[in-house]
Amino acid sequence: MPGVETIKSSWADEVELDYGGLPPTTETIENGHKYVTEYKYNKDDKKTKVVRTYKISKQVVPKTVAKRRTWTKFGDSKNDKPGPNSQTTMVSEEIIMQFLNSKEDEKANDPLLDPTKNIAKCRICNGEHWSVNCPYKGTAMDTNLMEKKAAAAASAAVDAPKSGKYVPPFLKDSQKGGMGMRGRDDTAAIRISNLSESMTEADLEELVKKIGPQSKMYLARDKNTGLCKGFAYVHFKQRKDAAAAIEILNGHGYDHLILSVEWSKPQNN
């Protein structure tokens, strides 16, 4: 009688005969690794066995994170083990957050600390530099400056009696001259105050030479140090130029200081 030939079956056939369906997922831990075995159907409707290997490592986390991992799961994940389930949970990309304190925010928003902001402003071209250093001096850009000078001279001649302010007698009638006892004409003289100690005669001439011709300039200096005492006198040849100088330079920023320009008061005889 011939012997019966035995045919070896595959593990998939054995699993199908034993369980008649998909076996449950199993997990085993050996030598610092976790092996997860699960069964599923592939595209051809055949049972497949998938084994995933995880390396176990210890990680120091904040207390709040460790406490959150001990929360009881609910819903469809009620019977899942601690940690994310690969079938229901997908880990997205890691986001790194950087926290700034309030002092750094205030420092970043401080406009005075902005290196791109310049405190200087030119009166000729509105650039970020002083008017004395303007590259457009003497060009067509000076047209606006000359118009201001003419308007200031006209307002000084017409509107001065209507302002209601005190006007010195030597300024009430420009046609009478204004010659003092010493023969000096002070009607076209102005006083410039709040000058820096580093001010020189060349700087003073550069400041007023575009306004009109001058007959004399005096920069007050300290006898001991030779530094500027903070004020100067400029005598223009025409009174309208002096009025224009007051209109243009009064309140003008120069060398980090705000200039104060007014009519020069005559000396007492």
UniProtKB/Swiss-Prot annotation:
SUPFAM superfamilies for the chain: RNA-binding domain, RBD (SSF54928)
Pfam short name (any one): RRM_1
GO molecular function, one term: translation initiation factor activity
CDD domains: eIF3G, RRM_eIF3G_like
One BP term from GO: formation of cytoplasmic translation initiation complex
InterPro entries with a match to the protein in the record: eIF3_g (IPR017334), eIF3g_N (IPR024675), eIF3G_RRM (IPR034240), Nucleotide-bd_a/b_plait_sf (IPR012677), RBD_domain_sf (IPR035979), RRM_dom (IPR000504)
Keyword field: Cytoplasm, Initiation factor, Protein biosynthesis, RNA-binding
Record-level GO cellular component terms: eukaryotic 43S preinitiation complex; eukaryotic 48S preinitiation complex; eukaryotic translation initiation factor 3 complex
Compartments where located: Cytoplasm
Stretches assigned to the RRM domain: 188-266
Transmembrane segments: none
Gene3D superfamilies named among the record's database cross-references: 3.30.70.330
Family, as annotated: Belongs to the eIF-3 subunit G family.
Function noted in UniProt: RNA-binding component of the eukaryotic translation initiation factor 3 (eIF-3) complex, which is involved in protein synthesis of a specialized repertoire of mRNAs and, together with other initiation factors, stimulates binding of mRNA and methionyl-tRNAi to the 40S ribosome. The eIF-3 complex specifically targets and initiates translation of a subset of mRNAs involved in cell proliferation. This subunit can bind 18S rRNA.
Subunit structure: Component of the eukaryotic translation initiation factor 3 (eIF-3) complex. The eIF-3 complex interacts with pix.
Protein name (database record): Eukaryotic translation initiation factor 3 subunit G-1
Species in which this protein is naturally found: Drosophila mojavensis
Encoding gene (name): eIF3g1
